[in-house]
């Protein structure tokens, strides 16, 4: 996958993507990140990319000309089709389902906003998608872009050591992930669950599914309303409820 990022602060992307999993993915040519400063496409003497809003109001808006020219230049250099994504608090909420959707593309173009927002013509005539990472406001879209890039990159085959790694992540199957343990089996008097030492994979799988359901039920019960639970899942939930609320 190729990801083009349009930003006013290209330096912000240097360190995070030169380390760990993303660096290995880039070294294998599984993911290619290209950063473009759209200030380079402003042609006035001050290289201005923002201006005051018509009708008055607080803040400055990103002008349409530099953004349109930047996207057009990027597409001229490489005509591979790509969604043009605005990162904005007004967009659809980013989640694991959206990450999977984006991971199916060969290429993404991501525009990082700044200041008060965009001239509406950018939203109407340039962007093909608009994404928000949550109901809060950031100074710019750069951190949001990093979140999207990281989440999407993990889903590209070969980026993680095993495809099972991304499939078992929280939210990948609609549930929070089960607890994990490693050596030592006893630490400061705290034991790991006996079933994990049993070698019985069927029991271990059942325990993991049950604990995933338990954690989701406790922390994010809303998630259970969005998935189809099997008869076995419902039986596990009944067991959990009986354990959590024992009768006298």
Swiss-Prot record:
UniProt subcellular location: Cytoplasm
A GO cellular component annotation in the UniProt record: cytosol
Binding positions for S-adenosyl-L-methionine per the UniProt entry: 113, 133-138
Catalysed reaction equations from the record: guanosine(37) in tRNA + S-adenosyl-L-methionine = N(1)-methylguanosine(37) in tRNA + S-adenosyl-L-homocysteine + H(+)
Keyword field: Cytoplasm, Methyltransferase, S-adenosyl-L-methionine, Transferase, tRNA processing
EC number: 2.1.1.228
InterPro entries named in the record: Alpha/beta_knot_MTases (IPR029028), tRNA_m1G_MeTrfase_C_sf (IPR023148), tRNA_m1G_MeTrfase_TrmD (IPR002649), tRNA_m1G_MTases_N (IPR029026), tRNA_MeTrfase_TRMD/TRM10 (IPR016009)
GO BP, sorted A to Z: tRNA N1-guanine methylation
GO molecular function list: tRNA (guanine(37)-N1)-methyltransferase activity
Main location per the UniProt record: cytoplasm
Subunit structure of this chain's protein: Homodimer.
PANTHER family associated with the record: TRNA (GUANINE-N(1)-)-METHYLTRANSFERASE
Similarity comment: Belongs to the RNA methyltransferase TrmD family.
Protein role: Specifically methylates guanosine-37 in various tRNAs.
Protein name (database record): tRNA (guanine-N(1)-)-methyltransferase
Gene (UniProt): trmD
